[in-house]
Amino acid sequence: MGAVLYHVSEFRGITAFEPRVPPSPDSGIAQPVVWAVDDQRLHNFLLPRDCPRVTFYPAQESTESDLRTLMGPSGCTVRAVVAIESAWFKRVRDARLFLYRMPPDQFEIADAAAGYWISPRSVSPLDVVEVNDCIASIVERQVELRLVPSLWPLRDAVVRSSLNFSCIRMRNARAREGTTP
């Protein structure tokens, strides 16, 4: 059986996804594609699209020190952490998302650690599930939702660590302390 893939949207009723150029050059992909995420990393996207977040989880080579420092005491009971800025809490709480299940045979893996899959052609979803409680959907996946005043200190620590991570929509995060917006 192949991977279970999703495209997450705040819009209902999408019948086909068209390839688009990725908004960030960090993806390393220059051509237009349709993006999907596998079920293992779906928690990274169970938030409003523009919500900045830092997500992280153990890698095979993660050190005990990094696990203890960044995953915290819950590290033994959660499989990942999704951190958002506390200013986004109400928007996350009130968000409604649509999980479009995608046909895996039309996608190829782009980044195994991040769970990213891409297709260079138009893709029609197999079905759709509505999510009315993003917080519960994240927590039910054994993922900690962490609220922080600013993502930057955590982002910097995670990037320097031995953990796997994704930093998503950071352009929407609060300005770093000591910088002008």
Named regions from a protein language model:
Residues 4, 34-35, 97-100:
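A broad, low-specificity signal marking well-ordered, structured residues that form hydrophobic/aromatic
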Residues 25-27, 34, 88-92:
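A general structural signal for short secondary-structure junctions and capping/turn motifs
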Residues 10-12, 36, 104:
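Short, flexible loop/turn elements at secondary-structure junctions
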Residues 39:
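Long C-terminal interaction/binding lobes of large macromolecular proteins
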Residues 47-181:
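Conserved NAD+-utilizing ADP-ribose enzyme module
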